[in-house]
């Protein structure tokens, strides 16, 4: 099994826009090697009789019925804003025509 080289760590660090010193390079090389060893162990597991899944547990959505409600607090809400025009908030223009 090949070990992670310093050059490989530097390449990954460069892609991630990280600047690593020599100690950090050695540390990351060791950590990446441990991760790859773990993956190699997982690859040896026989999963032929295990059904494919997308999640470890079943996820169920709980829906509620939408209900329309009339709101009488529009004026109160508009008063909270810094600026308004009629029944709308007034905001600074950000798009030039």
From Swiss-Prot:
The enzyme class is ligase
**Enzyme Commission identifier(s):** 6.3.5.-
Query: Quick check: keyword Ribonucleoprotein in the entry?
Result: no
Residues passing through the membrane, by range: none
Q: Which reaction does it catalyse?
A: L-glutamyl-tRNA(Gln) + L-glutamine + ATP + H2O = L-glutaminyl-tRNA(Gln) + L-glutamate + ADP + phosphate + H(+); L-aspartyl-tRNA(Asn) + L-glutamine + ATP + H2O = L-asparaginyl-tRNA(Asn) + L-glutamate + ADP + phosphate + 2 H(+)
Q: Which cysteines are joined by disulfide bonds?
A: none
Q: What GO MF terms are annotated? A: asparaginyl-tRNA synthase (glutamine-hydrolyzing) activity; ATP binding; glutaminyl-tRNA synthase (glutamine-hydrolyzing) activity
Name the Pfam families on file.
Answer: GatC
Positions the record marks as coiled coil are: none
**Gene3D superfamilies to which the protein is assigned, alphabetical:** Glu-tRNAGln amidotransferase C subunit, N-terminal domain (1.10.20.60)
Q: Name one GO biological process term.
A: regulation of translational fidelity
Which keywords are on file for this protein? Answer: ATP-binding, Ligase, Nucleotide-binding, Protein biosynthesis
- UniProt keyword annotation of Plastid present: no
Would you identify the family this protein belongs to, as annotated? Belongs to the GatC family.
**What's this protein's function?**
Allows the formation of correctly charged Asn-tRNA(Asn) or Gln-tRNA(Gln) through the transamidation of misacylated Asp-tRNA(Asn) or Glu-tRNA(Gln) in organisms which lack either or both of asparaginyl-tRNA or glutaminyl-tRNA synthetases. The reaction takes place in the presence of glutamine and ATP through an activated phospho-Asp-tRNA(Asn) or phospho-Glu-tRNA(Gln).
User: Assembly and interactions?
Assistant: Heterotrimer of A, B and C subunits.
Q: What is this protein called?
A: Aspartyl/glutamyl-tRNA(Asn/Gln) amidotransferase subunit C
Species of origin reads Prochlorococcus marinus (strain MIT 9301)
Chain's gene name: gatC
